[in-house]
Design a protein with these regions (language model features):
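Short, basic-rich loop-to-helix N-cap that marks the start of a DNA-contacting helix
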Residues: 46-59
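Short C-terminal boundary/hinge segments that cap the last helix of small helical domains
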Residues: 62-70
Length: 70
């Protein structure tokens, strides 16, 4: 994660590769992360992501946040 808790962008390709192992769909990942599918979709399509949201997504994927950012 960047210093100071700045917004970051999620690397869509890295997340998609991790999703091949499960959870397999955006709906499943969103549910596991405790966020809406719409929020996950926006992040996957390039919207900046706050550190808290990044943490939820990375935890649901079973990786460290730094592993899924651009």
């Amino acid at each position: 994660m960047k210093k100071g808790g700045e917004d970051v962008r999620v690397d869509k390709i890295k997340v998609q590769l991790l999703m091949t192992k499960g959870p397999h769909t955006q709906q499943e990942l969103a549910a596991k992360a405790g966020i809406s599918r719409q929020t996950l979709s926006a992040v996957m399509n390039g919207r900046n992501c706050r550190p808290e949201l990044l943490g939820k997504i990375s935890k649901a994927l079973g990786v460290e946040p730094k592993e899924i950012i651009e």
